[in-house]
């Protein structure tokens, strides 16, 4: 139903961002990669959108690039992979690293995603391996960074947000040790995501 949305970026709230368009604030679920690239509040952005409608839920999922949106749709086509798991896979590493993991059959990497077990990881590899261009292997570098608990409320909220994106508490804590804790929750999350995604 929707192709994209343009509007003012209003901020991050755990696993979604808010974009205001014509006086309406849209709640848009997104990946760590898209979250980490958000501009300052009030600046204009454009996200490519996928709407998911279920009996008990209607949600908008937005991505900075068409390539990431297409990968999201491909992941959703796999039996056993829901929107939360797909976003988690797109949040644990950069898009090219995810493709590299699928092409090379790296089940261990895929199992880092929320709700992704060995069987689901194997299914993702089996069904998507041939759909991804093997020449993309040349552009994919498999690198992994590992997200900190602090007494401050801001860091605690950032930790919760990173875990909801699919990172383990250990990963979240590790990265948050190195961020500037005097920043806002939003900037702490952005800094952590940049570190996590290399």
From Swiss-Prot:
A GO molecular function held by the record: four-way junction DNA binding
UniProt keyword list: Cytoplasm, DNA damage, DNA recombination, DNA repair, DNA-binding
Family: Belongs to the RuvA family.
Region of interest (Flexible linker), residue spans: 144-154
Job description of the protein: The RuvA-RuvB-RuvC complex processes Holliday junction (HJ) DNA during genetic recombination and DNA repair, while the RuvA-RuvB complex plays an important role in the rescue of blocked DNA replication forks via replication fork reversal (RFR). RuvA specifically binds to HJ cruciform DNA, conferring on it an open structure. The RuvB hexamer acts as an ATP-dependent pump, pulling dsDNA into and through the RuvAB complex. HJ branch migration allows RuvC to scan DNA until it finds its consensus sequence, where it cleaves and resolves the cruciform DNA.
Region described as Domain II: spans on this chain: 65-143
GO terms for cellular component: cytoplasm; Holliday junction helicase complex; Holliday junction resolvase complex
Location(s) in or outside the cell: Cytoplasm
Region feature (Domain III): 154-198
Chain positions covered by the region annotation Domain I: 1-64
Gene3D superfamilies linked: 5' to 3' exonuclease, C-terminal subdomain, DNA helicase RuvA subunit, C-terminal domain, Nucleic acid-binding proteins
Notes concerning its domains: Has three domains with a flexible linker between the domains II and III and assumes an 'L' shape. Domain III is highly mobile and contacts RuvB.
Protein name (Swiss-Prot/TrEMBL): Holliday junction branch migration complex subunit RuvA
Primary gene name: ruvA
An individual GO BP term: DNA recombination
Record's subunit section: Homotetramer. Forms an RuvA(8)-RuvB(12)-Holliday junction (HJ) complex. HJ DNA is sandwiched between 2 RuvA tetramers; dsDNA enters through RuvA and exits via RuvB. An RuvB hexamer assembles on each DNA strand where it exits the tetramer. Each RuvB hexamer is contacted by two RuvA subunits (via domain III) on 2 adjacent RuvB subunits; this complex drives branch migration. In the full resolvosome a probable DNA-RuvA(4)-RuvB(12)-RuvC(2) complex forms which resolves the HJ.
């Amino acid at each position: 139903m929707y192709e994209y949305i343009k509007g003012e970026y209003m901020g991050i709230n755990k696993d979604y961002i808010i974009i205001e368009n014509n006086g309406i604030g849209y709640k848009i679920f997104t990946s760590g990669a898209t979250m980490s690239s958000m501009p300052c509040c009030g600046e204009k952005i454009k996200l490519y959108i996928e709407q998911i409608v279920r009996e008990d839920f209607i949600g908008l999922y937005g991505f900075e690039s068409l390539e990431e949106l297409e990968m999201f749709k491909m992941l959703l086509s796999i039996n056993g992979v829901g929107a939360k798991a797909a976003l988690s896979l797109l949040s644990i590493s950069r898009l090219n690293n995810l493709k590299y993991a699928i092409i090379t059959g790296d089940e261990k990497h895929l199992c880092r995603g929320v709700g992704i077990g060995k069987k689901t990881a194997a299914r993702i590899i089996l069904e998507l391996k041939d759909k991804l261009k093997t020449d993309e292997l040349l552009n994919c570098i498999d690198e992994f960074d590992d997200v900190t608990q602090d007494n401050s409320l801001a860091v605690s909220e950032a930790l919760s947000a990173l875990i909801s994106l699919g990172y383990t508490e250990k990963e979240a804590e590790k990265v948050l040790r190195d961020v500037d804790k005097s920043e806002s929750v939003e900037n702490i999350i952005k800094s952590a995501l940049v570190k996590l995604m290399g």
